[in-house]
């Protein structure tokens, strides 16, 4: 039997790896579009600034073809280069288009009519057509210019420093548009505005050279539609990653923005690794996770096997990105989302409510994270040289702060389906510990017992962790049955409910809330507003309210 299981594990891993061809293999050739890219061989800042504005106008033009916009984008991203001829060769690697370089000497005064070099392959009709496209801005562009300030285009630019400041200000906006061009292009632009504010604060973006939102949207749309441009940008990102600490301004900027672009489209995979495997909590030993753990192992090997370009699978439209979809490991994904919802407030802004999300295992993750927040990792504690008393003190401190007992305020439970703004809890103060703005613990989930007098025997948990929280001497009521957040899984046998109540902590500890003296005076509160009196002979009453009360 063991040989069959080993063969299954090897089969699962090889199934992910054997589909990939050799690196550098040339795909079957398809029809290619001709893309004209403009090259300026002189460092003249005036000519380059005119080319910058010309490219912006071509991208925003309402009658420009896709090939016109692709050529304008590649030219735009190549303008800071001292040797544009060599830099544009990065785009030659793309099997999607045929790049034609057109050397330009300048523009006719007062117009955007190109003055081609003798070696440029441009006809008079093409030059006239480009001039018409540059003047054909859509009515959604205000003041006849892509910039917010109407006088920016007409300003003189006779210094290299002036050109670089203006060019970097425009390019950094284009790079920010790359961040969401493949994953959330139709979402509100709140994240883009925050990044613009960040780069303005750093001095990389001058507010005077901000583009209109419509111009930014058109740039993002053009990048999204062109695989050639995205392949070119991927090479730029790889160049930026290889730079040392002594780099130029442009690649330092690209490397910074690249952190927002890397691993886009793989968020579910990395969050699953972080909150499911990274925590190393006992529910990972469930038999239901065995097959999916093998799947995650094969995906980690696939990611390493792809190499440097694995960070840009979404940007490159690589088919391998489908292998990392959470639909291939739904149970452990659901468990990880439950853990992350409790541990990380920002997780509540992540859309994890997929059709395959299992409410049963999501609740396992929620309950486990609530109970495990006060445990101590023995290996880390040994490295720090903590004594048993110090470990107990840390655990008690976390418990008190998570419950909000320091100020006599009971901590409110976390409902992952309510926006974080509606879950604000009063600040909890415990002696000289800084106040917490929000409590991520339920207040009733990890025992609820006041710390009794006398020596407490620590409870040893799975995963090499020890729980130093005091255990109640007696619990007068039975454990609450597991009530899932999803109604479709509510008909669970009682024996399974009894088992779920034991995951992440000891049994019969999650209904009482004790006061500061350790007396069980408050009624226990369960899911959906049910209260359980401390007096077993008293009938339970229905409490109207929600999690936030």
From Swiss-Prot:
Keyword annotations: Capsid protein, Helical capsid protein, Host cytoplasm, Phosphoprotein, Ribonucleoprotein, RNA-binding, Viral nucleoprotein, Virion
InterPro entries for this protein: Paramyx_ncap (IPR002021)
Modified positions (Phosphoserine) in chain numbering: 439
A single GO cellular-component term on record: viral nucleocapsid
Region Disordered: start-end pairs: 517-549
Subcellular location: Virion; Host cytoplasm
Pfam families named in the record: Paramyxo_ncap (PF00973)
Taxonomic superkingdom: Viruses
Protein name as it appears in the record: Nucleoprotein
Organism: Mumps virus (strain Enders)
Gene: N
